[in-house]
Regions:
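A nucleotide- and high-energy phosphate-metabolite-utilizing enzyme signature
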Residues: 1-467
Length: 467
């Protein structure tokens, strides 16, 4: 069924006398929310509060239009999650028991017209359950949207049938595969937006966090970071870290919306300085406020990417348990399982810190290894704190690092991986200080660490092709 639009030149809306009242309520609520942001309230609370305000208003408008009993109103998308950013669309699903006849179509048009008149920017669809299921089968975006549906008003029995059908038609393994492909394509699409990254869509952004929770929810494993922690998918420390990064990104996006005065997810050059001021940052002798903010963003995005990789691997092991993959030892400390490097035990790096750099040597020397297993990746991330002055002075560690640099192959790739896992900046503190550091001008497209790694890669290409 095509989406219904408020008809141009239609008869006057019977709710016209109440529209001014509803409009004032919405404006007052939005003003209060902006004041709460200035009071440094939790971004999660702000997003939920904004959604709750719109919930109450929608229910009031729905009741005012006396919608038929066999019609249901549901929140979907981000609004369905109970989160609403200042200038985001309010995504709605009007669920029908049967295709709409003329009178019902007219009432829906009036309802949508009222919502637009009071200042709610609505993204909507009007569908039967069968139409929802058909579209979801053909489009992973629609399927994801329906997964987060939340009842607002109308017939509960119809909504319950809809939820059961969506659940029955959902295959967790297929859903996971489709979402991971979608994420890979999205990362490629936004790979060149280094100077002005997209808080929502770029790698390490909010969409990556949502992808993890979508997959977990589809598999019935959990709907929140605390729930995933209780289920053993992530550790309590990882849950706390990822919530901290999520709240920072949410706070940044909220302020960006207010700064732009519209729905905007790109950290455009012109907004970076006022955003930094909104976070209480000030210029220093050698670092602008905007550069401080962007470094925090880049480091947060890197951490999100790393932890999300661990969680996605753990979810994959539960959704599609691998057949009994053999462990092929490389030495006493490491082996290969399912094409991934695996440590003999998760406490290896604590017992033998030199194994940290050894793991990268093995990745460099064995191109058949496609990555690092989740337990080893987690242990490696935790072991960064062991890279101390004594670690750097240790002869074995110095030799291993030089072996990485002297290798005829995959040097640039390993340096990038060392940086990605937070090891390079720990081993070379001078490099650590410039991780995520950008220069606030239109000439320097990459952060300083990324620029250095690209230069090293290009210099090597003059003599040795990276295989």
């Amino acid at each position: 069924m095509p989406e219904l639009q408020p008809a141009a030149g239609a008869v006057a809306n019977p709710q016209q006398p109440r529209i001014g009242h509803w409009k004032q309520k919405l404006l007052a609520a939005r003003t209060q929310l902006r004041e709460e942001l200035s009071a440094r309230k939790s971004p999660r609370e702000l997003l939920r509060h904004q959604a709750a305000v719109v919930d109450r208003l929608l229910k009031e408008v729905w009741a005012g239009h006396a919608m038929p009993r066999d019609v249901t109103l549901a929140a979907v998308g981000g609004y369905g999650r109970g989160q609403l950013f200042p200038y985001s669309d309010v995504d709605l699903l009007i669920l029908l028991a049967a295709p709409a006849e003329a009178e019902l179509a007219r009432k829906i048009e009036e309802l949508l017209g009222t919502l637009w008149d009071i200042g709610i920017e609505v993204g909507h669809s009007v569908r039967t359950i069968d139409e929802c299921i058909t579209l979801a089968a053909a489009d992973i975006t629609v399927q994801t949207t329906l997964l987060e549906a939340r009842l607002l008003a109308g017939r509960r029995a119809l909504y319950s049938r809809f939820v059961r059908r969506v659940s029955d038609e959902l295959d967790p393994a297929d859903f996971q595969q489709a979402k991971l492909l979608e994420q890979q394509q999205r990362h490629m699409r936004y790979a060149e937006s280094n100077l002005e990254p997209n808080i929502k869509e770029s790698a390490g952004g909010l969409r990556d966090l949502q992808t993890v929770l979508w997959i977990a929810r589809a598999a019935g494993i959990g709907r929140s970071w605390s729930e995933l922690s209780r289920r053993g998918v992530i550790t309590a420390i990882e849950a706390r870290e990822i919530q901290q990064h999520e709240q920072f990104l949410q706070s940044l996006r909220i302020r960006l919306h207010y700064c732009a005065g519209r729905r905007e997810d790109r950290l455009l050059f012109d907004f970076q300085t006022p955003l930094a001021r909104a976070f209480g940052l000030h210029d220093r002798p050698h670092r602008l406020a905007s550069e401080q903010l962007m470094q925090r963003y880049y480091r947060s995005a890197k951490a999100v990417s790393h932890i999300a990789t661990i969680v996605l691997q753990n979810l994959d092991a539960r959704i599609t348990p691998p057949s009994d993959k053999e462990y092929h030892p490389l030495n006493e400390r490491f082996g290969i399982r399912d094409e991934l490097l695996a440590a003999c035990d998760e406490r290896l790096f604590e017992r033998k810190p030199s194994a940290i750099l050894e793991s990268f040597l093995l990745l460099q020397r064995h191109p058949e290894i496609k990555g690092v297993s989740a337990p080893t990746l987690r242990a490696l991330w935790r072991a960064r704190r062991l890279i101390s002055p004594a670690f750097r002075k240790d002869r074995r560690n110095r030799e291993q690092f030089m072996q990485l640099l002297r290798s005829p192959e995959r040097v640039a790739r390993m340096l990038r991986r060392l940086n990605q896992y937070g090891v390079l900046g720990r081993y070379l503190p001078v490099f650590g200080r410039i991780v995520g550091q950008m220069q606030h001008d239109l000439y320097h497209v990459y952060t300083v660490d990324e620029h250095i790694l690209k230069v090293l890669r290009n210099v090597r290409r003059f003599a040795v092709p990276e295989l």
